[in-house]
Curated annotation (Swiss-Prot):
GO molecular function: endopeptidase inhibitor activity
Isoglutamyl cysteine thioester (Cys-Gln), cross-linked positions: 970-973
Species for this entry: Eptatretus burgeri (Inshore hagfish)
KW Protease (keyword) present: no
Classification via SMART domains: A2M, A2M_N_2, A2M_recep, ANATO, C345C, Thiol-ester_cl
Annotated ranges, domain Anaphylatoxin-like: 658-694
Protein name per the record: Complement C3
This protein's encoding gene: C3
Length: 1620
């Protein structure tokens, strides 16, 4: 009996067994069993009968269940056969618990930070049938660190699993992220896909660079490239390319300085050639370039729109010999006397196939020395085939291959030698398979020829055939022999996709097994039917067309659909789920050792991935153990299991599992050494075996992968245009849509469904993909369907990120005409309210255009926002004489002038301390320099929990960055944001108060935010688990401790690998000094807070606290942990008695109290702390001599220490002080004080009784414009969720609180502050200059964009404080229409003379970080400002320098690009008219003709004054008129006004050009109350177009003997006849 089975199997697959009776003389019953090798118990069994009816062959399947396998520890199952009473055979089949595959799909291939990634998973068997399995998914950043873990439980109805979205953090690692998924019950087998994270905008067109050869020979005279630029919608780009070449060595790039050139496009294509002279000028000896690479950059500028897209062709090898020769596709054995087809693969240096290369093939047999030479050329796939007629008695075939490229010298040609052995047969018999080359599809027949050579061939009446695919035998059949050559036709079934091995064999009467095998490719196709198409087959649509998608698939299947803008795939397409990826994964299940044949008949089976056993057949000793021999690399990509099985066989049985498990990849990506430390109870020798096998697998897999990487109109006049009412405006431009799963039920007609979708407005090509999962037919990834949304005539509107009020900015429209005729027409621009254009009043802006066919033109227009409200622009272009048109609407974001500011104050509310009723008076004055016309708001917020405001704003989306107004660009800043959320989430968890927050999803979102923060922080982690403010700087002990502390706290809430925490702990332990203190090599914290002498105490306390927080996670993971902690405690104890300053004292007191409250040093330190604080009856705080931020942090540590020591009175007083120090929203001055204050306050709240009585009543009263009254109550139920009340922005507020409990009252006023020429500076001086950069301007005009200027910004500051500075930040606002040149910022950061350590670009702003500041001289930064939009009337903007940890120390200055424009020509035409329409009009000298109008206005106006001008000043944007009131005829809302009072009247700068107001002038001013704002006695009035502004004569003039008529007018004017 001959038994054939796969060389390995899975506990989740059936085991197919083929059985043949060698001696076909009698009917025999064969009993086939699967046996537990440990107990001998039968797992499954079948009985088959071999007889004449079935040609004495049988094919059966057995199954072993995963639950049974889990009961024993062996890595194999025993296959046993019994027949004829007592005869039996058995063989051990290696067993894997691999269950199947998991494929992942994302809704886009690339994302920007702060976006959501939608993920689908498709868990299937190796045969692609759906699996019901719970899954675990790790999201891994580019550094290989798991930043989020998502678990998804299986449900019967879900064949496609959609995960919750993964939120990419706002600050994170850019690059390639991984999605690592595995089935929950099989964590040892994981599957990887991915997505990319970059800061990008979708390209408007695709630029690709190709070279005529994929390498540069070191002596090449020329190197030619081809550049292709195509719009995403398929049309060629017209324009030019700026081409640059350079040399890359490792990561360093060197530009070939004389190689830059312009290349012009024709029909979207351009060509350029690099000449050898350009290289020799910089590298006279080309041989020095060997081993380096060439790169090519191309910036393509479209001539129509001026848009720029870039591309790079990278890593072009510079070589002396450009080719390599491989023979991996060659069958390793030949049959003597049968033509042998030798395949050679020639590769380029980049691994791509080298086509058209002449080669010389020489061969000889045995040791004859007689070489026969033939010449060939490689095909497109790099393969050249040579047929060699072999000699009948040859044992060895020698082959030499050499390239014959005529461009190369002989020494530069590639060559290789190979030896092919003959098939070995004792009788000289063999069988040879030859398949017809055409690749067939499932359902078709494959035809192949079988050739036999044997002296005993008359005894061979039939051949036996096995078809093996994906590690399984799919068919076993027998066909009769028809002479020396037999043609056989076999039906291809879907199970054989993508390829199968065909084994043919016969058995001679002598017992010799003769066999051959080949690999046959099957055309990739799905078993399941899936079709997604558009009804009618249409591929071209217009925006907003309804598209009917016809979906056809299997009944009861699930189809996942997604649509992506093809522009996204221009940026990254490697992670797209394709059918090819699925089939490649299936190929990995192949168990074969070679591409076919074998040394002997039995070895043919082994090399085909089969295990065989037979008693009657000779040569079986070679195959008694299944699997490939040493030295043979399998074609599959997943080789780990086989390597481990082979290695495990060299160990005793009790250690084989230790070795085998080493092959299973750790989900946490731990090293072999780290994994070994987790082995504890597996017996003696297991750790050593595991480590040795783990390293062996890594080395062998690396070798194997290296080998595998060798693979490869007509015109009807201008009187007709489409009516505007018929126009559809395009305004919806998503990157992806239609992320849906569609169920095809049995009730659907033949598995069909029609889906109707409206296409978005984008002019682009959409890539539409459908993936089907059928219960019966498995997974099918359908081909992409591309639909182009296009108009032959369309617009593209270019707008800046934001406009600023009163600034004049150019907007540009590009008109594309892809029709086959030139067109003329009209373009019409309408802007929303509050936008001035060059149009007539209440009319759209119109202009005519002419565009040639297949061309484009641009149209520009100026806009000026008059208000700070967002608006929109709508552009319509219509062609004369036709209905051809397009319209686009875009939002215009308008930012008010000035900077956002807020002022706030908090009060502790404790009525019981005030006799049961507490009265709080809130000053509500308007700050100086408020921008006129901007909204101002004031709020009062009262809550019954000291940290409620912080919790609300942290967890409910009120952005911390806005409240704190600090940048976040380094590792410490990022941790601050994460740690705040950790603090409040821990508090709500401990106090079980999530249900009181009023949002059931809040807990989940909070945990997601923490996970996202963890991911962001890993951006700053080094390989040794230490952290630095920036990766290129030295690691910081303090920051690493901060991270370890927060991660330890966060681990109680979300998944964070212990290895991350303990890795940092190990690094910290190495920073401990002999005396127990800790050393800091790169300070991050504010040095002033640490003190000159006590800095070591502060740092040691901080690290000590972090280690205690991490104790639970690391005490058993980190060797020596306890010793280090005890040494640190000893050091702090010795220093506690040394008269520490407030901050070191407070942090030391808290650190010692964490160790043990009863400790003597802890008690003494706490006593000292109590007596040193600044106390009142209700408050206590520490550290005020070091600034507000230091005082907050010191008091926070003092409060934490008091809580530990149960010092209730001290804790309550410290809590009161901290509560009153918070800003609106619950935040403080900077990062660390906010973090520690919040930890302390939540700690205080946590230790209060959960059942404490809360019943506070509040009454708010304001007397302004009548009476404002508001009453509300706070109880335990709403202590967290009380919202702020909006209160009047003017006038004193009185708040009366009564009842029981303790709360906090916060007042905040928000407003826009004018940019002033000079502001008060504290701790810094600052100088700003901006000048036109003529040299840069000239270069830009030669290359990229000639229209706009370039300016150079220089900012210099001096540090004026008498102490060492900490980190300094420069916050630089950019003028509208300008952007910072990124290369200059990179140079400031990266060059050896670096000025900054990091920068951060935000819309309209740049943050620069300096950690090296010279106290004794100026510190300067500088970069170029590129003008990207034309702007006139540009307003000044502000640059500010401040200390990061003490932001009160700052200096701000305004600056302005020195524009080359005439100030008198800053506006023109109707823009000026539009601006003036909103301006106050000076009526001139009083005149009797205006009497009626004057009196009518006096009756309508709410205030009527006659003023005398005392002073006129100008700011950046306004004229301020200070005046004394000479007559008050109507007071309006300003009831406190009287004659002689002083008031200010404000006019926008662009309105004051022709007013000529001077001190001493007298004016009549009448207007409405909504145009003024007040600040105590400094009420200011904004003069607008609704204001009556008339000049009155001077009193001295009216006393003249003959006064002018205007004097009579002024004397007679008494206002409205109705008294005001």
């Amino acid at each position: 009996v001959l038994v054939i089975a796969p060389a390995a199997t899975s506990s989740y697959d059936d085991l197919a067994v083929a059985i043949l009776m060698v001696d076909q003389k009698k009917i025999t019953e064969v009993h086939v069993l699967l046996v537990n090798p440990h107990t001998g118990a039968t797992l499954d069994e079948k009985k088959v009968k071999l007889q004449w009816d079935n040609k004495f062959i049988a094919f059966t399947k057995l199954q072993v269940t995963p639950k049974e396998v889990e009961k024993w520890k062996e890595d194999f199952v025993r296959l046993m056969v019994k027949w004829d009473g007592g005869q039996h055979m058995e063989i051990d089949i290696p067993l894997t618990s691999r269950r199947g595959l998991v494929f992942a799909q994302t809704d886009q291939p690339i994302y920007t930070p702060n976006n959501d990634v939608n993920i689908r998973l498709f868990p299937v068997t190796r045969q692609l049938n759906p699996i019901l399995s719970s899954l675990v998914v790790d999201i891994m950043n580019p550094d290989g660190v798991v930043v989020d873990r998502i678990e998804k439980n299986a449900f019967e109805v879900e064949k496609v699993m959609e995960l919750r979205p993964f939120h990419v953090p706002a600050i994170t690692s850019l690059g390639d992220w991984k999605i690592v998924s595995w089935m929950k019950d099989k964590p040892q087998f994981n599957y990887t896909s991915g997505f990319k994270v970059e800061e990008y905008v979708l390209p408007t067109f695709d630029v690709s660079i190709t070279s005529e050869q994929p390498y540069l020979h070191v002596y090449d005279k020329a190197f030619t490239i081809h550049i292709k630029a195509m719009h995403i919608y398929g049309k060629p780009v017209m324009g030019r390319a700026y081409v640059r070449y350079g040399v890359k060595h490792q990561s360093k790039r060197t530009l070939l300085s004389t190689s830059s050139a312009l290349a012009r496009f024709e029909q979207g294509e351009a060509m350029h050639t690099l000449r050898q002279k350009h290289i020799l000028e910089q590298y006279p000896d080309p041989k020095l370039l060997l081993g380096q690479s060439l790169y090519v950059e191309a910036s393509v500028i479209s001539s129509d729109a001026g848009e720029i897209e870039n591309s790079i062709l990278d890593d072009i090898p510079i070589v002396a010999s450009p080719y390599s020769i491989k023979s991996k596709w060659t069958v390793p054995f030949f049959k003597p006397g049968v033509p042998y087809i030798y395949k050679v693969l020639v590769l380029n240096p980049d691994g791509s196939p080298a086509s058209g290369v002449p080669i010389k093939v020489s061969f000889s047999f045995d040791s004859s020395g007689n070489w026969i030479t033939q010449k060939r050329k490689t095909m497109d796939n790099g393969i050249a085939m040579q047929t060699i007629n072999t000699a009948r008695n040859s044992k060895k075939l020698n082959i030499k291959v050499q390239t014959e490229d005529e461009r190369l010298e002989q020494s530069q040609q590639a060559e290789a030698s190979f030896t092919i052995a003959s098939y070995s047969s004792p009788s000289g018999s063999f069988i040879h398979l030859n398949a017809h080359r055409e690749v067939k599809s499932p359902g078709e027949h494959i035809v192949f020829d079988v050739f036999i050579k044997s002296a005993a061939k008359d005894h061979v009446l039939h051949f036996n055939y096995l078809m093996i695919s994906n590690g399984k035998i799919h068919n076993f059949l027998q066909e009769g022999r028809k002479g020396d050559t037999t043609s056989v036709s076999l039906l291809l079934t879907p199970e054989l996709v993508p390829q199968f091995r065909l084994v043919a064999f016969f058995i001679l009467p002598s017992g010799e097994l003769v066999a051959d095998s080949i690999i046959i490719d099957v055309k990739d196709s799905c078993h399941a039917k899936l079709s997604l198409d558009v009804a009618g087959g249409k591929r071209l649509f217009s925006p907003r067309d309804n598209v009917n998608f016809d979906l056809s698939g299997e009944s009861d299947s699930w189809v996942a659909v997604g649509v992506v803008d093809k522009a996204a795939y221009v940026l990254d397409k490697k992670n797209k789920l394709t059918a090819n990826k699925v089939y490649k994964a299936m190929e990995a299940s192949d168990l074969g050792c070679s591409v076919g044949s074998g040394k002997t008949g039995p070895l043919v089976f082994r090399d085909a991935g089969l295990a065989i056993m037979a008693k009657e057949i000779s040569g079986m000793d070679d195959v008694k153990d299944p699997g490939c021999p040493n030295g043979h690399t399998r074609r599959k990509r997943e080789l780990v299991l086989e390597i481990a099985i082979e290695k495990a066989s060299t160990y005793p049985a009790e250690l084989r599992k230790c070795c085998r498990d080493a092959a299973i990849e750790s989900p946490l990506r731990l090293s072999c050494e780290e994994r070994t430390k987790h082995i504890h109870d597996e017996g003696e020798g297991c750790q050593e075996t595991f480590l040795e096998c783990c390293k062996h697998v890594e080395e062998e897999l690396l070798i194997a992968m290296e080998e595998e990487d060798e693979d490869l109109g007509r015109s009807q006049g201008e009187d007709f245009m489409i009516q505007e009412s018929q126009v559809v405006i395009r305004s919806h431009f998503p990157e992806s849509f239609m992320w849906e799963i569609i169920k095809l039920s049995r009730s659907a007609e033949n598995g069909k469904s029609r889906i109707t979708k409206k296409m978005p407005d984008s002019i682009t090509t959409w890539d539409i993909q459908a993936v089907e999962v059928s219960q019966s037919k498995g997974l099918c990834v359908g081909p992409s369907l591309e639909l182009t949304v296009f108009k032959q005539f369309f617009l593209k509107v270019h707008t800046p990120y934001a406009l600023k009020q009163y600034e004049q900015v150019e907007l540009r429209v590009v008109i594309y005409n892809y029709m086959n005729q030139d067109v003329k027409g009209e373009i019409q621009v309408k802007c929303g309210d509050g936008i001035c254009t060059d149009a007539e009043q209440n009319e759209p802006l119109k202009s005519r255009f002419a565009v040639e066919k297949n061309s484009a033109t641009s149209f520009s227009f100026m806009v000026v926002p008059l208000s700070s409200s967002d608006s929109s622009v709508s552009v319509l272009a219509r062609v004369f004489g036709s209905d051809v048109h397009d319209a686009v609407e875009k939002d215009l974001r308008v930012m008010p002038e000035g900077n956002y500011e807020e002022m706030s104050r908090s009060w502790s509310v404790q009525p019981r301390r005030h006799g049961g009723q507490q009265v709080i008076v809130v000053d509500n004055e308007t700050p100086q320099n408020v921008v006129p016309g901007t909204e101002m708001s004031a709020f009062l917020s009262a809550q019954g929990n000291l940290v409620a405001e912080t919790i609300q704003n942290t967890l409910k989306g009120s952005k911390i960055s806005n409240l704190l107004r600090l940048p976040r660009g380094c590792g410490e800043q990022n941790m601050m944001y994460t740690s705040i959320t950790v603090m409040v989430a821990r508090y709500l968890n401990r106090s079980d108060q999530w249900n009181k927050m009023g949002d059931p999803q809040l807990k989940k979102r909070s945990f997601d935010f923490i996970t996202s923060g963890f991911a962001s922080q890993l951006t700053y982690r080094k390989p040794d688990y230490s952290y630095a403010a920036w990766l290129h700087r030295a690691s910081s002990t303090w920051l690493t401790a901060f991270v370890a502390k927060v991660f330890s706290q966060a681990r109680q809430l979300v998944f964070i690998p212990v290895s991350e925490i303990c890795g940092s702990v190990r690094w910290l332990m190495r920073k401990q000094d002999k005396d127990g203190s800790f050393l800091e090599s790169k300070p991050v914290v504010h040095l002033n807070m640490m003190g000159q002498v006590t800095g070591k105490v502060v740092l040691t306390s901080f690290v000590f606290i972090a280690l205690l927080e991490a104790r639970e996670s690391c005490i058993n993971e980190v060797e020596g942990f306890t010793v280090v902690v005890e040494k640190a405690h000893g050091y702090l104890t010795s220093q506690a008695m040394n008269g520490l300053e407030d901050f070191p004292l407070a942090i030391t007191a808290y650190a010692l109290s964490l160790w043990k409250v009863s400790d003597g040093a802890a008690k003494v330190t706490m006593h000292t702390l109590k007596t040193s604080g600044l106390q009142t009856e209700e408050l206590i705080h520490w550290g005020s001599n070091k600034g507000k931020a230091a005082a907050v942090e010191s008091t926070a540590y003092g409060l934490l220490a008091a809580i530990q020591h149960e010092e209730g009175e001290i804790a309550e007083k410290a809590t009161n002080w901290l509560s009153q120090s918070a800003t609106f929203g619950g935040y403080f001055q900077s990062t660390q004080d906010t973090v520690m204050a919040l930890q302390a306050l939540t700690g205080f709240e946590s230790c209060q009784s959960r059942m404490k009585k809360m019943d506070l009543s509040f009454k708010i009263r304001a007397e302004e414009n009548g009476v404002f009254d508001k009453e509300f109550q706070i109880t335990n139920d709403n202590a967290f969720v009380q919202k702020p009340f909006k209160v009047p922005v003017h006038g004193q507020l009185t708040v009366t609180a009564s009842g029981t409990g303790q709360g906090i009252l916060t007042f905040v006023k928000k407003y826009r502050e004018k940019v002033v020429i000079k502001k008060d500076c504290k701790g810094f001086s600052l100088e700003i200059t901006t000048n036109l950069d003529n040299q840069v301007k000239q270069r830009r005009r030669q290359s990229i964009n000639p229209e706009f200027n370039v300016y150079r910004f220089i900012g210099c500051f001096r540090y004026l404080r008498n102490q060492e500075p900490g980190m300094v930040v420069m916050d630089i606002s950019l003028p509208t229409g300008f952007e910072a040149k990124k290369k200059d910022l990179d140079d400031m950061k990266n060059l050896v003379d670096n000025y900054i350590v990091q920068y951060e670009i935000r819309p309209g702003r740049v943050f620069l970080y300096l950690d090296k500041v010279n106290k004794d001289e100026k510190n300067c930064v500088g970069f170029r400002l590129n003008q990207v939009f034309e702007s006139n009337l540009v307003l000044p903007v502000t640059a500010t320098v401040f200390e990061y940890y003490e932001p009160d120390f700052r200096c701000s200055k305004s600056y302005h690009p020195k524009m080359e424009v005439n100030p008198d020509a800053s506006c023109h035409g109707n823009i000026c008219n539009c601006l003036q329409r909103h301006c106050v009009e000076l009526k001139g000298m009083a005149d009797e003709d205006r009497n009626a109008d004057r009196n009518g206005n006096a009756c309508r106006a709410e205030y009527v004054f006659i003023i005398g001008v005392t002073k006129v000043t100008k700011t950046a944007s306004y004229i301020n008129i200070n005046a004394a009131l000479k007559t008050v005829l109507k007071k309006g809302m300003d009831q406190a006004i009287n004659v002689g009072a002083r008031r200010s009247f404000v006019i926008p700068m662009h309105c004051g050009k022709n007013l000529n107001v001077s001190p001493g002038d007298i004016y009549l001013v009448m207007g409405m109350h909504n145009a003024h704002w007040r600040n105590s006695d400094r009420t200011q009035y904004v003069l607008t177009s609704d204001t009556w502004f008339e000049k009155f004569p001077l009193e001295s003039v009216c006393r003249l003997p003959s006064p002018p008529a205007s004097c009579q007018v002024s004397e007679n004017f008494k206002g409205c006849s109705l008294k005001g």
